[in-house]
Design a protein with these regions (language model features):
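Domain-level signature for soluble enzymes in the chorismate/prephenate branch of the shikimate pathway
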Residues: 2-393
């Protein structure tokens, strides 16, 4: 059998194909005869061939970038979060539909993930078990071509990245309804790790199970928070079904897979991992429930153009009048927007506190750099935990 090499597709050929594709009213018009339908299918096949050839060409170009850097004697950073954010923003800005922006971003994320895996598959530790929203955050940010490592605690995630057993880690930092994950903040007090990315994930709760109908459900298992977030839907649709709180939504999904009559409330990733059917989608009572996750790494990265910086600072004697104002005044003077501030006990001495601050911009931007230099002079403790691309959605 002779294997034919894929026909090379140039940028001009892709542009020609794009011009030949139907647009506007013609794109919406359905074929009215069998012959017309076959013609449309033939065009789809041709476009698929071009897409596949272009994706492979992109993968070859990505390999060339890595080889070129290695030959020059540079330390090769195969994963560049600032570059990936720029690519995603460009894809979003080009999008004219009919695909939604979210779908375009997901497709480009997976293409970049697959291309990166050809060079150096990333190992990403996350707060497990499998099927949790944290795993969904990993896949949203890195794509499905990474090696995702579920761990039992936030401490373990930090340790895996600190010891270089994992390239990156993903941990929750705050939820729009539940507030801050304090243990994540506290871990930064003793860790050298940097923040090199963020993920903002809309928490979508789905009812899932192995059965085909709601009438076959005898009990619904989920984490207590998820049960509370879906209280009204459960009251309206399954008022007589037992609600069983469990340690995690992943545990709920496992029980739904293994126990006859059990269903689970969990995220879409849990349905994929445990092979369950989604019986009812997005059953949460509030549609604005969002969790923010941080991506942990061992180094800082260059600006992407739309960035956020996270600081760890202390003013020393926080009981002195105006101490916090004097600490933060340089941000206002240099017109740097503060988006979040949290206080935590410093663990150094009684009633001594540190502040975790999020602000707009990258630490290397001149305006931000001037503000931080002034702030550093007023602080008894000052650390830039990270400057990283804002979540692309």
């Amino acid at each position: 059998m002779v294997r034919r090499a894929p026909r090379a597709v140039t940028a001009s050929a892709a542009a020609t194909a794009a011009r030949a594709a139907p647009t506007g009213a013609n794109a919406a018009a359905a074929p009215t005869t069998p012959a017309a339908l076959e013609a449309v299918r033939a065009r789809i096949d041709a476009v698929d061939e071009q897409i596949q050839a272009l994706i492979n060409e992109r993968a070859r170009l990505a390999q060339q970038v890595g080889i070129s850097k290695a030959k020059d004697g540079h330390t090769v950073d195969f994963y560049r979060p600032e570059r990936e954010a720029q690519v995603l923003r460009a894809a979003r800005s080009r999008n004219t539909g009919p695909l939604r922006d979210a779908e375009v971003l997901r497709l480009f994320r997976e293409i970049m993930s697959a291309c990166l895996a050809q060079q150096e598959p990333l190992k990403v530790a996350f707060l497990g078990p499998e099927g949790t929203f944290t795993q969904t955050a990993v896949l949203t940010h890195f794509g499905h071509s990474v090696r995702a490592l579920p761990l039992g605690s936030i401490d373990e995630v930090f340790h895996e990245v600190e010891s270089a057993s994992a390239d990156f880690g993903v941990v929750p930092i705050e939820n729009s309804t539940e507030g801050t994950v304090n243990h994540t903040l506290d871990r930064f007090l003793s860790s050298p790790l940097k923040v090199c990315g963020e993920v903002e994930l809309r928490v979508r709760q789905h009812l899932m199970g192995a059965m085909n109908a709601l009438s076959r459900i005898e009990r619904v298992c989920s984490h207590p928070q998820s049960l509370a977030q879906c209280r009204q839907w459960l009251q309206d649709h399954l008022p007589d079904v037992e609600q069983v709180p469990v340690a995690s939504n992943a545990e709920a999904a496992r029980r739904a897979r293994d126990e006859r009559g059990s269903a689970a409330i969990a995220g879409e990733t849990a349905a994929e991992v445990y092979g369950l059917k989604v019986l009812a989608a997005e059953i949460e009572d509030r549609s604005d429930n969002t969790t923010r996750f941080l991506v942990l790494g061992r180094k800082l990265f260059a600006p992407s153009g739309e960035d956020r910086t996270t600081l760890l600072v202390s003013v020393g004697h926080t009981d002195a009048p105006g101490a916090l104002y004097r600490l933060l005044e340089p941000l206002a003077r240099h017109r740097v927007s503060l988006t979040r501030i949290e206080s935590r006990p410093s663990r150094r001495r009684k009633w001594d506190y540190v502040f975790f601050i999020d602000l707009e911009g990258h630490a290397q931007e001149p305006r931000v750099a001037r503000a931080l230099a002034s702030l550093k002079k007023r602080a008894s403790l000052f650390r830039v935990l990270g400057s990283y691309p804002r979540a692309v959605q």
